[in-house]
């Protein structure tokens, strides 16, 4: 039994880090909570308040008090002797200004350039939101997350893309409209988080089928499988693979290509070999272009 367990663990480790791994898969097997945002402030500047968010209102100076209010079902909070302030759909900065203006109606020391009472509004407990991760996800389904969560948070909760899922064109759908597309390679290779938007109640994160997949072996820094977008070619692939190791021959790449069914002939191999000469990291003049096909 122990031997079977060790064998299964070795196979799992190989699937995440060995030559048979898909680039990016190990990212979703980090410790739990790596991408789980806190359930209380601070929040990004573009965070918009909603029903259930908790506000902490602090005033000091000529008047001192502290209030805690939860945004109610009407999307507002009620201030003593000052009335209602609408919060839902506004940023924290906008809400702070509205609260300061409302309090100034009953506390003269808050208003004007010579105000002797300062007001600060911060966020306490954040509301939960329900989002959906569908398509080719490892664990598709509905997830309750903090309202400070982003697309990456939802992906991590769902275990990331499945073996058949794309790492390159993950879509954030709000209503019936795609509002952002996340390329995980841009994040993993260059640290770029374009498309990693804050989530809202009812958002859907959709993982489509993967694009072309190419297997890199030999003396590169990260030999494994890579998913390639339209327009990407051999230099892009070598860049994703971390470049060549010192012992590599820098001016030649061998490609083993599996032929499409329409190109196969009876009695002939189902694959061909191509030698691509490189110059300055690109196919040399007169060499095959190095177009990469799925498989």
Where are the predicted features?
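Ser/Thr/Pro/Gly-biased, low-complexity, turn-/loop-rich segments
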Residues: 1-295
């Amino acid at each position: 039994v122990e031997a079977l367990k060790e064998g299964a663990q070795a196979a799992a480790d190989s699937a995440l880090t060995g030559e048979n791994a898909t680039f990016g898969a190990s990212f979703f097997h980090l410790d739990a909570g790596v991408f789980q945002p806190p359930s209380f402030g601070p929040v990004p500047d573009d965070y918009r308040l909603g029903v259930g968010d908790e506000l902490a209102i602090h005033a000091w100076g000529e008047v001192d008090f502290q209030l805690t209010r939860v945004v109610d079902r009407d999307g507002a909070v009620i201030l003593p002797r000052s009335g209602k302030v609408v919060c839902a759909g506004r940023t924290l900065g906008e809400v702070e200004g509205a609260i300061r203006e409302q309090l100034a109606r009953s506390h003269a020391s808050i208003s004007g350039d010579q105000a002797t009472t300062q007001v600060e509004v911060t966020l306490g407990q954040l509301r939960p939101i329900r989002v959906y991760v569908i398509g080719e996800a490892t664990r598709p389904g509905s997830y309750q997350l903090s309202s400070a969560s982003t697309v990456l948070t939802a992906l991590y909760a769902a275990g990331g893309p499945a073996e058949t899922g794309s790492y390159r064109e993950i879509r954030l759908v709000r209503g019936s409209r795609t509002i952002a597309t996340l390329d995980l390679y841009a994040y993993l290779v260059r640290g770029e988080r374009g498309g990693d938007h804050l989530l809202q109640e009812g958002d859907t994160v959709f993982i489509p089928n993967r694009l072309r997949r190419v297997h890199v072996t030999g003396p590169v820094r990260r030999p494994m499988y890579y998913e390639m977008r339209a327009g990407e070619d051999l230099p892009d692939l070598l860049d994703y693979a971390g470049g060549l190791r010192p012992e590599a021959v820098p001016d030649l790449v061998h490609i083993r290509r599996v032929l499409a069914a329409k190109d196969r002939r009876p009695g002939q191999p189902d694959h061909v070999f191509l030698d691509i000469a490189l110059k300055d990291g690109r196919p040399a003049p007169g060499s095959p272009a190095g177009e990469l096909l799925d498989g």
